[in-house]
Amino acid sequence: MVTRLLGRKMGMTQIYNEKGQCFPVTVIEAGPCTVTQVKTKDKDGYAAIQIAFGVRRSKNISRAEMGHIIPKGDLKPEDRKKAFDRQLKETKNAPEILREIPWDGKEDLKVGAKLDVSIFESYKKVDVIGTSKGRGFMGVVRRWGFHGLPATHGQSDRERAPGSLGRQHSISQGVPPGKKMAGHWGVEQVTSRNLDVVQVQKDKNLIFVQGSVPGPTGGLVLVKESTWTAPKPSTVVSKKTKAGQIVKKGH
């Protein structure tokens, strides 16, 4: 069963429910995606499929990737190059992105099969993976929420400075690994988990999810079945309680 689709963030809007309450939703164009490769446990050691989404000019794609997309057929090796060159000239468009997704191997999927947004009609919650917006080079105050140094008592230009970076005369001298410092912010993979599916429009390949989705308008995203579960509160057995009685940690 296929539980993931490539898509594009179209933007945000508002929707009213049956009670007249207004809440924000993100519109995602999920699919249609074309199956470009099928992997099985017998041949490849694991089951997965490769799907393609979007359209871009074939002149902007490498010859090796075009050879992966264009079917080779049952031609002889000496005839494949001529046939490939002919198909390469005839092919004007190519997929914008290729992505391999897990697959249980139970369905009879073949190369060229189409996958649309209808696979999410039975889902109540989904996860959306995207790339966050790039914010450029940021200081520690905006990037990490540092408080900054005092604005008075003799200082002149250290209000937004990070302060000390490490100790000099100690065993762990120098800047410790993972120290929060100024640097590039954004352009990272971000996952929005457990988003409610508000509406699915199969004819337009649109899915409406409640809340925000990472990335700019027009950015590529991956929509998948939500597997997130709320963490359970940690519990410990107190020595003062009776045997078998569980109390919450910190109580």
Predicted regions and their residues:
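Extended basic (Lys/Arg/His-rich) segments that typically form rRNA-contacting surfaces
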Residues: 1-251
